[in-house]
Regions:
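Pseudouridine synthase
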Residues: 424-428
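Extended, charged/glycine-rich binding lobes that contact polyanionic ligands
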Residues: 1-94, 101-107, 112, 116-417, ...
Length: 442
């Protein structure tokens, strides 16, 4: 973690900062997959053989692009659109519906629907979050609302289609995974065939946690998480408040720089920190009253944010261990002596106080990374804030990529279609196919 953030000039630099140091595809296609919202389509897969179709967009049979509306704005062709998911009657206290959204955060879209229905967050259930800067489809349940009421919802860039009644609420993880249809522009299409071949030959891609896990605009969560795990609360708060990144606003950068140069003047910092940095101001308000009470200042953050810091540091350690495994040439899809295996795949630890480390060379890698970081599994039992302690887990080294295909639709444009099981990051696949630049949305 001893990196000068001023050196993080490219997304490749940022990837290395969060532990993603290796790739299996040495020369990707380049390009961008975020030029248009319609370039990134995500469809939930309840099972391996089914997916929730998107009706908000259709494909032009002429140019191959995806658009909203009925006709292609470029060539005038009638767009080919999917049919609605079939509805059914059913019984139960929850109504299952399809949510399609265009450039909406998942929970903001659900809350907007909740306002229309006069229902709070806890009435809704979802199986998983979907990308914001994308067109997405997924199932949602809502308690105590008849299907007819859902048909009356009219919100810009949201389509709601009731399916029927069910007995239980959808819960996180109630899905097989997601299907992706992604258009990559300004690409070197000559490199596409080789990149696809490498990924298919491996059976997937390294199962890294992508940059968005750490904060795409300000990837500071794992840095804070390290000091949370070490229970160095002043250092954790110092990094959270003062660590600046070039993709932040000038106002935020100036405030962080001022506090770094005037550490301890928390009343003065409240005059400098802008109102939109509300979590930072919560901490500063506490420290202005109780200057050395860092642990309770940190408690001013919501529980889920405090947990997020610990999870981010676990993810960073996972990425570093996976990178070192690749650097040493150990296989990702086949176990070697000493590996801890799940579903036939070698696993990498998300370290925690209950974590079992591997033996042999895989275990040597795991222990050496923890030693370099100066942490032990027992450190994740956080005695001064036990509610954010982490028992740990293990996760496969390889992310299986299913139903992978690609089609070149112009001299520098291609469409790639693939499915990932739940927990898999599309960015992990795309950074291999394309390289890091152009993968992450602003």
């Amino acid at each position: 973690l001893n990196v000068d953030v001023g050196e993080l000039r490219t997304l490749g630099d940022v990837e290395r900062f969060v532990g993603m140091e290796e790739r299996v595809v040495k020369s990707g296609t380049g390009g961008s997959c975020r030029e248009r919202i319609e370039d990134f389509l995500v469809m939930e897969k309840p099972s391996e053989s089914t997916y929730i179709p998107l009706t908000m967009v259709g494909r032009c049979p002429g140019c191959g692009d995806y658009h909203r509306g009925k006709r292609c704005p470029r060539c005038g062709s009638t767009l080919s659109k999917s049919k609605l998911y079939p509805s059914y009657g059913g019984k139960g206290g929850h109504t299952l519906f399809v949510l399609e959204k265009y450039d909406w955060d998942t929970w903001k879209a659900v809350r907007r629907i909740g306002r229309e229905l006069r229902r709070r967050d806890k009435a809704f259930g979802i199986a998983g979050m979907k990308d914001k800067r994308a067109v997405t489809s997924q199932r949602v349940t809502v308690r105590g609302v008849p299907p007819e009421a859902l048909r009356r919802i009219d919100v810009k860039d949201i389509v709601v289609t009731p399916l029927g009644r069910v007995r239980r609420k959808l819960r996180p993880g109630d899905l097989w995974g997601n299907r992706f249809v992604i258009t990559v522009r300004d690409a070197d299409v000559d490199a596409l065939e080789t990149a696809i071949h490498v990924i298919k030959d491996l059976g997937g891609v390294p199962n890294f946690f992508g940059v968005q896990r750490f904060g795409s605009r300000r990837p500071v969560t794992h840095v804070v998480g390290k000091y949370v795990v070490k229970e160095d609360w002043e250092r954790a708060i110092y990094e959270f408040l003062t660590m600046e990144f070039p993709r932040e606003s000038e106002e935020a950068i100036r405030a962080r720089r001022w506090l770094r140069e005037n550490w301890g003047d928390f009343e003065g910092a409240l005059e400098v920190f802008p109102r939109f940095l509300d979590y930072e101001r919560e901490i500063l308000e506490h420290l202005a009253r109780y200057p050395n009470d860092y642990v309770n200042a940190f408690r001013r953050l919501p529980y889920w944010i405090r947990r997020m810091f610990v999870h981010a540091y676990q993810s960073y350690l996972f990425n570093r261990i996976l990178s070192e495994r690749m650097r040493r040439g150990l296989p990702l899809g086949e176990p070697v002596e000493g590996d801890i295996v799940r579903n036939g795949l070698p696993t990498i630890p998300l370290p925690g106080f209950r974590t079992e480390l591997a033996d042999g060379e895989p275990g040597d890698i795991e222990r050496s990374v923890l030693e370099e970081e100066g942490v032990e599994p027992s450190d994740f039992e956080i005695r001064s804030m036990p509610e954010i302690s982490a028992g740990g887990d293990r996760k496969p080294a390889l992310l299986r990529v299913h139903r992978l295909s690609a089609e070149v639709i112009a001299d520098d444009v291609y469409v790639v279609t693939f499915s990932l099981p739940r927990g898999g990051y599309a960015t992990s696949f795309l950074r291999e196919l394309m390289g890091p630049e152009g993968v992450y949305a602003d």
